[in-house]
């Protein structure tokens, strides 16, 4: 046999093998059942076929970026200088999702508060619990006094007066909102979108907007880099030109080397490889999980979330008197670089409001995700 013919046969065999393997993974569009017409005709064809339902194609929600499913090593990516020993490394898998590109801004949160506190006494959404204006102001309206309460002997009056609603701060991250307020915002955002979809064409409901789990947040912050110390990938806090890569406190009494003494407008710094900005610095971010020092080895290794059972009743409702600790991640404008690391864990009580804690939302991506559908 000639050498050329041997190579041709070998290449043909390899192509056939690759084709077989990819088709078995469903990557060639094979696997959907084939058949006759759209009527049952005594066969099990699926209710969607009988009702002639439209197919489902999940859109990327406004302001969000797609995060493909993947596996990574959760935990501390560098030294633990405080010897906390609360974030050991563990390999886990995260499902596909969408996440807000930026932290929720003052302007976006103002749309939420205006909906409930508008000139007409607040609007209502179908199948959404009614909230009195008094309850809304007490639980969900931003606490503007955090700029005075959080810091001793600090001239915070200008921020108390202007940070929340002045147009000069509309693109800055909202602060002074508790975990409960951030969680309620996600529920309202879900109802707000799905009511519009129902009214405009009876479209199927989208999955819920919610706070990301701690594991989801860390996975997204690393941007596909398994052991990245910071969201931008390398272990340095400045780029090659000497510019800071995030809004934080780089040294004792030094808040301004990054260009901002307090918070910065969202999206000022470069995004990570998933397109997310401010995953380090600016404001820390609420996560869905209850905080427990030993939760990482405790939880499952697929889409983990730690739930403190003592904080909930048998129906899964939060017990009001139990002020659970909630995970916060990412570090803020007032924190040193250690708190900006992707693996650093800390917490705050769920009813607390701070001048350095905000949030962003996530949404589950229904169905399989190889990441290729977003290319």
What does each of the following model-derived ranges do?
Residues 1-36, 220:
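Bacterial Sec-dependent N-terminal signal peptides
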Residues 6, 25-215, 325, 345-375:
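Extended beta-strand/loop cores of jelly-roll/beta-sandwich
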Residues 15-16, 60, 65, 86, ...:
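Generic hydrophobic-segment detector
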Residues 37-45, 67, 73, 78, ...:
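Functional-site microenvironments in short loops/helix caps that host divalent-cation chemistry
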